[in-house]
């Protein structure tokens, strides 16, 4: 490992972070750390098309580059990535640490490239991350590149990109429920009927309930609303910025292990993540000023009362 990675104001950094949304949000701390450590450096982010627009709004990067993560047999895309990685970067910080980015180091990077990551043979290897939260993993990597570890993660860049909840004429106070998550892992979903029961209990305490999700979550969100018809259904109707603005003003947010819940925690909203056996809280618990998690094996074992008990520790409006 290099004794020091002090980078001059004229040097160039490349940060690799592909996604998904939760992974991007957990990287905010590392992004801020690198920018605070190198306030005048040129810092580029390599990410996927899905997050290029969001990354372009971030205050930490001078340039956003797109990686389509094409198969290796796509010669044109592979050569494009090779040309990119062969540019005179002073340091490449791999925050994805995937098999794909390991191949990037092994086959595409310059032989003498300074590379922070977990791939064998890189110049600045991260320590063993077994049992370490994903947020902290990226903070450690940023620290190896002389990031400022106590840098403030200012979310105004995202929150100011959307109208406040009052401008949307939403009732207050309100709770946000996130009933969806990856369709590939239904075992990570708390049952829709339990979300509906939670919504009804919250409404009985004079809290409005707002349901959110992507278009892919529409079926489960609609099912929740059918059983808790007083809920407001905003599924598929919010941008990431609008979702963040909705979350930050919420009395509480409850949802599965999915990107919007990490976003809620990052805004400082009182947040509860519901976990099943596929989620290891040591590695994947959300980070934020007021967040918690509760796990069931299977997730269907989690009771509505269990969730309400956790909420009572985060907000005064749930009794």
What is the role of each PLM region?
Residues 1-319:
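Catalytic machinery of carbohydrate-active enzymes
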